[in-house]
Amino acid sequence: MASPTASSILQYSGTGQKEKGTLDHGDVPSVDIGKGETKEVFQENVDGVEFRTVSWQRATVVFLKINFAMSILAIPAALGALGSIGGSLCIIGYTSLNVYTGLILGDIKHNHTECHTLADMMGLIWGRWGRELVGVQIIIAQTLVTAGGVVAITIGFNALSDHGTCTVAFGLISAIAVTAFSAIRTFSKLGWLTWIGFITFVIGVFIFVVAVTQVDRPAAAPQTGDFDLGWAPIAYPSFVVGMVSVTNIFISTCGSSNFIPVISEMKRPQDYRKACLVAGFIVGAMYLSFSLVIYRYCGVWLSTPAFASAGPIVKKVAYGVSLPGLILGVGIYQHVAAKYAFVRVLRDSKHLQANTFTHWGTWLGINIALGTAAFIVAEAVPILNYLLGLAGAICLAPFSLIFPALLWMHEFKKYKTGTTTQKVKYSFHVLIMMFGFFMMIAGFYSVVVLIKEAFDTGTIAKVFDCADNSGFVQGK
């Protein structure tokens, strides 16, 4: 991972008190450290909802579930396009880079406790309009990822029931289940359920990974005669296919912008770095090991999502075990968007933490609206890889690469003309920003091209389609 220069954003005096930062606060309420006043979004010891109750261990589990989720169902197909070496380097590289930028965001949050989301942070640079623009981007990103989750859950329902009813009906049930979980108000309470979700999802994935090593050939491969597994250390995909595959790997660990609201609810926000590093290491190791095993035994004969590759029985078992984890994991993404909008509407009012009608009406109304939007998007583009790729390109590349680099450069603007070492550090973050722009533009173009091809070829036959979506095969 890159050099730990992000840690220098936050400096402590001998008493452990945080020194005042150098950022221009713009329209975001400032912090007067000298007077001991803070502008934390959620206050402690209030007559109402206590939000700041999350331990670093529980935060770690939330971070794990944010990042280790639907992507494990899409990454093996990405390795099929990139090869084992190319895919492995992408997983290691993106995990390291996303952890590093996550540490930058955490340090900015510690230096500016009034920031509840990435939108508030960008308001430090761009003012009110920048904050609102990034806020809209957060809603779009979380809606796209939630929609991808709804698609994954409908696949699970179809697999378990042998397509027992119209897929649109399963989509509606999925959106309702996700919204019910998302409507739990605090990350602390979500944390207990997240433990269950994370464990069940990992067990489901592990069952599938073991099962796929025991079959003679992948379910999608020809069932008689010789066939070419298609495994390769290095593959040579087209630019469009390669970019979508790279974007799907990138999105697997780029959830660090979702960590920021969790920091606002931690008992000890200074423990964030510990939680971020532990979660990043575990998630990267699981993605790398599980994906390599799946690709080794399936090659290019991968179903999308991957659970179908081991046959119908294993697919049912894996989905049956992991479905609670899928629902809970997707609910966290919607919860982050809902919490942003909720705080945006009620910030600095008595209704933010008081159990009033306005509090509950706003919270539930926002969750229902977001769940409805995710359902509509899921039925309009019902392929998981494309939804994740779209979210990664237009939203998560800025969130995890461009914006953290800009925040670092704004904090250390003097490095631009400083010593040679300082100039190198500044240039490194300029490169991160430029790479983020490349991911955003090239990724968006590639995903749009593939979505158009999917409609043209009938892979996506129509919107709000009742057809079974649990057996789509990607391969030769």
From Swiss-Prot:
One GO molecular-function entry: L-amino acid transmembrane transporter activity
Family matches, as Pfam families: Aa_trans (PF01490)
GO cellular component annotations of the record: membrane
TM segment ranges: 72-92, 133-153, 164-184, 192-212, 231-251, 275-295, 317-337, 364-384, 387-407, 431-451
Annotated glycosylation sites: 111
Keyword Membrane: yes
Keywords: Glycoprotein, Membrane, Transmembrane, Transmembrane helix, Transport
Organism domain of life: Eukaryota
Induction comment from the UniProt entry of this chain: Expression is induced in response to 2-benzoxasolinone (BOA) exposure. Expression is also induced in response to 6-methoxy-2-benzoxazolinone (MBOA) and 2-aminophenol (2-AP) treatment.
Membrane topology designation: Multi-pass membrane protein
Entry function: Transmembrane transporter; part of the Fusarium detoxification of benzoxazolinone cluster involved in the degradation of benzoxazolinones produced by the host plant. Maize, wheat, and rye produce the 2 benzoxazinone phytoanticipins 2,4-dihy-droxy-7-methoxy-1,4-benzoxazin-3-one (DIMBOA) and 2,4-dihydroxy-1,4-benzoxazin-3-one (DIBOA) that, due to their inherent instability once released, spontaneously degrade to the more stable corresponding benzoxazolinones, 6-methoxy-2-benzoxazolinone (MBOA) and 2-benzoxazolinone (BOA), respectively.
Organism, scientific name: Fusarium pseudograminearum (strain CS3096) (Wheat and barley crown-rot fungus)
Gene disruption: observed consequences: Shows significantly reduced growth but does not affect tolerance to benzoxazolinone.
Subcellular location: Membrane
Family: Belongs to the amino acid/polyamine transporter 2 family.
InterPro entries xref list: AA_transpt_TM (IPR013057)
Protein name: Transmembrane transporter FPSE_08127
